[in-house]
Amino acid sequence: IVRAILKYLKTVPECFCWKEHGGMYGTAGIPDIICCYHGKFVAFEVKTETGRTTALQESVINKIQKCGGKAAVVRSVNDVKTVLEDMVV
């Protein structure tokens, strides 16, 4: 799912994104994909249809939103499209 989302995001004008890598050198709880879209900070936590966020992931998502960024749990490319469409005014 992450690969398909990144492939899509790389085609979106005014969107710069990257995959945040976990593991021992990553920061726990940081969403999977980070973007700058039309100058706005956007973070996507990617989950399967049955996947659930952890308490730490929810906390990070809430912090991003409180700081004025956009953060969302997505399960498909269509979910990402919806988030980006809602951001464009």
Give the residues covered by each predicted segment.
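Catalytic phosphate/metal-binding cores of nucleic-acid and nucleotide-processing enzymes, i.e., regions
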Residues: I1-V89
